[in-house]
Amino acid sequence: IIVDETDRLSALVNSVMELSKVSSGAEKLNPVDFDMSQLCFEVAGRYDAVCEQNGWTLQLEANKECMVRADPAMMERVLHNLLGNATHHMGADGVFVLRAIPMPNGGCRVEVEDHGPGIPPEELPHLFDRYYRARQDAGKTGTGLGLSITKAILQQHDFPFGVNSTVGKGSTFWFEMKAPQ
């Protein structure tokens, strides 16, 4: 129990420090041009073992080049936060989806979809708030900071983001990235 609680407290402290650095601007952006589809492919590959262990399926829909300008390390953190969130809200089918969709005017729309319980409309405005936990999250592990960190990173990049959700069907978290200049 002591080891578990120490790990939990350590994760919380690390999340608070990460959020503080990103929110304050202490962690500076290092934007470069890169293919977001390729980053999605690399990040999805890191979920192979956990998916196999749990009988889950991560569907990757990132078949077309999706050139963007952003900080790839920060975008990787966003992907891990959203995919981790999806694994906590996995539906009975065990499927979650990562999409990188080229936008007509350039750039890329990224979506992470789960087939879980969905989020009631009255909770949607609070999802990205610090420490906010949706009612169905009561008793689940986590710091309640992952979506706040995601929000801070996306705001620092000036990327629009949001969530679409239907109770009983699941949720899709999305953000839109700018094309290289």
Language model: regions and residue ranges:
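Short conserved segment of the HATPase_c
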Residues: 119-131
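Short helix-loop "hinge" at the ATP-lid/N-box region of the Bergerat-fold HATPase_c
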Residues: 86-87
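Conserved glycine-rich
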Residues: 158-159
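A conserved beta-strand-to-alpha-helix junction within the catalytic ATP-binding
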Residues: 30-45
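Short conserved segments within the C-terminal catalytic ATPase subdomain
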Residues: 50-59
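Short alpha-helical segment of the dimerization/phosphotransfer core of two-component systems
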Residues: 4-9
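Conserved micro-motifs of the catalytic ATP-binding
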Residues: 24-29, 67-70
